[in-house]
Amino acid sequence: MTENPLGYEKISKLLKNFAVPSIVASLVGSIYNIVDQIFIGQGVGYLGNAATNVAYPFSTICLAIALLVGIGSASRVSLCLGRKEPKVAAKAAGNGIVLMGIFGIIYLLVGETFLSLLLKAFGATTDVFPYAKQYARITLIGMPFLIVTNGMSNLIRADGKPKYSMVCMVVGAIINTILDPIFIFVCDWGIAGGAWATVIGQIFSFILALRYLWRFQTIHFEKESFLLDIKESMKICSMGISSSSNQIAVTVIQIIQYNSLTYYGALTKYGADIPLAACGIVMKTNAIILAIVVGISQGTQPIIGFNYGARQYHRVREAYLLAVKWNLVVSTIAFIAFQFFPQSIISLFGNGDELYFEFAVLFMRTYLFMVLVNGVQLLSSSFFTAIGKSLRGALLALTRQTFFLIPLTLLLPLRFGIMGVLLAGPVADFSAFVLSVVLVGIELKKQKKLAYNLSHSI
């Protein structure tokens, strides 16, 4: 029996201890954008909502970078600890932290330099562009802090302290929520107020996350741990590529969707701006559900990674299947909300005319129709990453967005117009679900055989 609780504690208890704080922390990340959207929608109107939507790809790119290094280094740490290689684990964590800082600064400089060009590429219309530029120029300042915070949160969870990771994110979200109405309404800063509230909240989360450097328990840092090693950096990135590639694909599909909606929307009674605003609201609402799924997958990652490294395959299987059950409960609740209460949800994000609500309700009901199954692909991709099969995890992460959703979003509107953009979502969700079930089923059978051979060789 291994000394680490990950190797012997009851799986349901471990998942509760690791996943619940991860879910809260992940939810907080999505709440940053949603809170801004709600207050900006109330204070500026649907053009303000459209502006935050156009700027949203900056956040998804930021998350992709954080996942690349954060999940990658955390996965390396969990596997190395399971194999009883503490020095390698410390090196992986140290190199991961250094990479977070480097990538964060580079991202800020590139974003600010090409801001106008990028916003136009993201689908900003003439009316939306000035709002989007004002909002994005400010929020980009907080991106390096956000990358380090999100990346560190994965390492903190791998160290066995998911609650501290949660606190880091929650504190920033609370500050953001308090400052939003003050800056937007009291100070009358409009959309800029929402942006500054977000940045200040991110800085507070960053400070708390950085303080944990001196609190790691399973990882013992030395100066050499923070010396950038190319080979170790490549290993980190290879293990984080599946989670990161999924976010990159999310960014690509956002850009394609925004441009498709403005183009085909202009050919309908809704115009170009209404579909753009409605799309962002629906996506950010769905982001709450996806944040829960991401939290579950992040919570299972150290459990699966450690037990796979320790060759306790029955516990790997149990952890994955329990995570899927949790996801099904969340997805069922989401399906009921999206299908039966769409207008109530959309109303939270500000007022609009009849056409605005008509399209937004249609968008939510159609695009999110297969929400019941769309979390399985994320869980399965994370599963393969946790067991060190990063290439398979990366390919699976790309299935929904790259292999299904992007082609469908480009092709279906040619036949169905703007409805084609909406229909692409559920078709891609179901296709990715089927592929995930097949691939994970094959892997679990292999592990069952390994477990059998291991038990008979002792």
Where are these regions (language model features)?
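Hydrophobic transmembrane alpha-helices of multi-pass small-molecule transporters
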Residues: I61-A64, N176-D180, F206-L210, I288, ...
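Small-residue-rich hydrophobic transmembrane alpha-helices
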Residues: N49-L109, L146-S165, Y258, A278-P342, ...
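Helix-terminus/linker motif at the lipid-water interface of multi-pass membrane proteins
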Residues: I31-A50, L119-T126, I182-W189, T251-V282, ...
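Transmembrane alpha-helix boundary and packing residues in multipass membrane permease domains
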Residues: S22, S26, I38, S75, ...
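Short runs within selected transmembrane alpha-helices of multi-pass transporters and secretion channels
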Residues: G70, T139-R157, S165-A173, G194-I207, ...
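Transmembrane helical elements of multi-pass membrane transporters/channels
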Residues: N17-D36, I138, T149, G172, ...
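Residue-level signal for short hydrophobic patches within transmembrane helices
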Residues: S12-I31, V35, F58-I65, I141, ...
